[in-house]
From Swiss-Prot:
GO-annotated molecular function: ribosomal large subunit binding
Cited SUPFAM superfamilies: Ribosome recycling factor, RRF (SSF55194)
Species the sequence originates in: Chloroflexus aggregans (strain MD-66 / DSM 9485)
The keyword Hydrolase is assigned to this record: no
Keywords annotated in UniProt: Cytoplasm, Protein biosynthesis
Subcellular location, record wording: Cytoplasm
Function, in words: Responsible for the release of ribosomes from messenger RNA at the termination of protein biosynthesis. May increase the efficiency of translation by recycling ribosomes from one round of translation to another.
Any Gene Ontology CC annotation: cytoplasm
Xref: HAMAP family: RRF (MF_00040)
Top-level taxon of the source organism: Bacteria
Name of the featured protein: Ribosome-recycling factor
NCBIfam families in alphabetical order: frr
Amino acid sequence: MLNDVINEYEAHLKKATEALRHHLASIRTGRASAALVEHLHVEAYGTNMPLNQLANISVPEPRMIIIQPYDTGMIKAIEKAIQQSDLGLNPSNDGRIIRLPVPPLTEERRRELVKMVRHRVEEVKVSVRNQRRDAIDDLKKLEADKLISEDELHRGQERIQQLTDRCNRELDQIGAEKEAEVMAI
């Protein structure tokens, strides 16, 4: 029972870390990356679909993204989705493919992006703290119901705190790496 609570908590930490990595991948840096646009939602065939299901996305050079729709009739919808996103990119098309030049970031925009990164890291840390509280409450309930001993409760709390500390260090590292990537010219 103790291990069930700890394993469930550890699974939540992994999910939170992966969610942060996924979110930060979509934040623009000075370099072109398919991750910037692949999850943009495009109004297509009466529903919203991620761009990576509608087109082939490639990065032939460091400051250019090429989007080649499987159906050329989707070009206007894809351009609209890119323009409505907060990426600050201006698409151009030749009727078959969309070229997406990625201009260098201004110093001001870099600072805004760093703030976004820090804010997102903090949101995930709050989620981790809330989950830690819930896991410890679950352990206390097990102890109150006499399903685990007081010693097991303390061991479980220590293990949960160790996992939390390790996760927070990893989240800080992920955030610092993204900040460095954003600030690199």
